[in-house]
Amino acid sequence: MYDLLKTIDDPADLRRLDRRQLQPLADELRAFVLDSVSKTGGHLSSNLGTVELTIALHYVFNTPDDRIVWDVGHQTYPHKILTGRRDGMKTLRQFDGISGFPRRSESEYDTFGTAHSSTSISAALGMAIGSKLNGDDRFSIAVIGDGAMTAGMAFEAMNNAGVSEDAKLLVILNDNDMSISPPVGALNRHLARLMSGRFYAAARAGVERVLSVAPPVLELARKLEEHAKGMVVPATLFEEFGFNYIGPIDGHDLDSLIPTLQNIKELRGPQFLHVVTKKGQGYKLAEADPVLYHGPGKFNPAEGIKPSTTPAKKTYTQVFGEWLCDAAELDARVVGITPAMREGSGMVEFEKRFPERYYDVGIAEQHAVTFAGGLATEGLKPVVAIYSTFLQRAYDQLIHDVALQNLPVVFAIDRAGLVGADGATHAGAYDLAFLRCIPNMTVMAASDENECRQMLHTALQQPNPTAVRYPRGAGTGVATVKAFTEIPLGKGEVRRRTSQPDGKRIAILAFGTMVAPSLAAADALDATVANMRFVKPIDAELVQALARTHDYLVTVEEGCVMGGAGSACVEAMMESGAVRPVLQLGLPDRFVDHGDPAKLLSLCGLDGDGIAKSIRERFLSHAADVASPAKRVA
């Protein structure tokens, strides 16, 4: 099994194969990807769709000297397997294992780290210009999906690249008619019209004939090809940017891919190759439902993904989706917005029930935020469902277009804190710090499912921009209450009180997901625990009261410490006369790698044992055991 694949330890081995061996290799590679992902979980559909393209690129180009930048990067498993990491696939996305995305520190073939979309053309152009300035003669290649082409950054890069006539730059549009959710917007309709038109179908066949018979392209041949293409193919959007447009060609046909890429190698200036692929190619279940098989957990390939037979705790994403539908039922002004994450953000049901109030704006976070601001000026109640890591991409819009004008936009921030297998690129580590410094913002962090629901309701009642952050995955098991209750603005609550005497009294000020482990730590230490709920406005009265009645304060958050929620507590404490020693716990000042979420929290010292250990080391190393029966406040 995998007889050919076992002989490939790097692309040099691949380039020694006879062309006739490449399709059998592709079949083995596709089977290996399916087998590997079924055992570890990970991105599947996108990787099954890039097998032949990956083989062709490494076969034709002299990687790693020629640079390949994979946009988003979740389609790079075939690339990793062909570049010396075949055996590492058994550790994919696991702690101390290989990443699910390209990483420069992992391999010289990973020329640029990616995970967020639409960055590849900018990076590849920088490489192409840098190589030219250094006197190096190499190609720089950006592989970008049709979904990622909805982002403005891709067009900013193309606008710049189009005037770089002597850059050896190739942009490959991997057109699979999918991003994660189906792509949306005028650009995708434009591509669909071009590809489905009768005139274009005939033109495409003519261009493919030209490409298939062309010898290595000399300048004259290139001019003849462009002249012939100009006679039969309508001018495209990409040619208007200054690119030489080639395609579309079948991205699963090595006999089309390889000669075309070999011809492109002889050209200078920005080239644009349009390849058509199918997500899930070669695995019928993934072909039929590429969204379901986009990022599955472990499963049996022979049976496919089966519904869980054990009742699962409700996820925070589900809590949000249910709340949004309930809120829209009660108020016709509620509008839902997602930047191309319908399924991931829990908006499938909302789209079905309220299609006229559902807006998927594509991978366009900047536009999503300002679009929401515009809706708010007309008296609507926009809710932007967005991952914490992607909100970073719209920071100027958040400040300039929403907060500065004090517009009532609700930000439902999913994937706050660590996200497990997706690693540092997707961690929501910074939102508390970058949100709390913005004037007019209200910021809440949910500690359980029902609190999340009520916080979202509270956010919708505010006359200013308001954010509610919540984590990935299942909640704590707390049932949600159908009736809505508005949470008092800027007020936390004490969940447990210490019985320790003066000199040993510890108060833990916990935010969001850190309330539960803080209660566990408090049981071991007999400490007070406050569920702070609001990061902004911080409950200054509660902070100051705890400072007056306790000897030590501890702040705990699943976010960066510098500038985060703990800093807000320190600032509030310093305004009072009662200044106490403070221990601020949170994510470390480094990027946290991928792995099991519980293990990562433990390594960061943010589980119950870790919190208790840090408190003992800082404040109690000189004291006797202070544990006593717990006294929690209902």
Swiss-Prot record:
A cellular component term, taken from the record's GO annotations: cytosol
Enzyme kind, highest EC tier: transferase
Signal peptide: none
Name of one Pfam family that matches: Transketolase_C
Pathway annotation: Metabolic intermediate biosynthesis; 1-deoxy-D-xylulose 5-phosphate biosynthesis; 1-deoxy-D-xylulose 5-phosphate from D-glyceraldehyde 3-phosphate and pyruvate: step 1/1
Keywords: Isoprene biosynthesis, Magnesium, Metal-binding, Thiamine biosynthesis, Thiamine pyrophosphate, Transferase
SUPFAM superfamilies assigned to the protein according to its UniProt record, in alphabetical order: Thiamin diphosphate-binding fold (THDP-binding) (SSF52518), TK C-terminal domain-like (SSF52922)
Keyword ATP-binding: no
Binding of Mg(2+), residues: D146, N176
GO molecular function: 1-deoxy-D-xylulose-5-phosphate synthase activity; magnesium ion binding; thiamine pyrophosphate binding
Cofactor(s) demanded: Mg(2+); thiamine diphosphate
Binding site for thiamine diphosphate: H74, A115, H116, S117, G147, A148, N176, Y283, E365
Gene3D superfamilies: 3.40.50.920, 3.40.50.970
Cofactor note text: Binds 1 Mg(2+) ion per subunit.
Domain of life: Bacteria
Catalytic activity, reaction form: D-glyceraldehyde 3-phosphate + pyruvate + H(+) = 1-deoxy-D-xylulose 5-phosphate + CO2
EC numbers for this chain: 2.2.1.7
GO annotation (BP), single: thiamine biosynthetic process
Function: Catalyzes the acyloin condensation reaction between C atoms 2 and 3 of pyruvate and glyceraldehyde 3-phosphate to yield 1-deoxy-D-xylulose-5-phosphate (DXP).
Quaternary context: Homodimer.
Family: Belongs to the transketolase family. DXPS subfamily.
Name assigned to this protein: 1-deoxy-D-xylulose-5-phosphate synthase
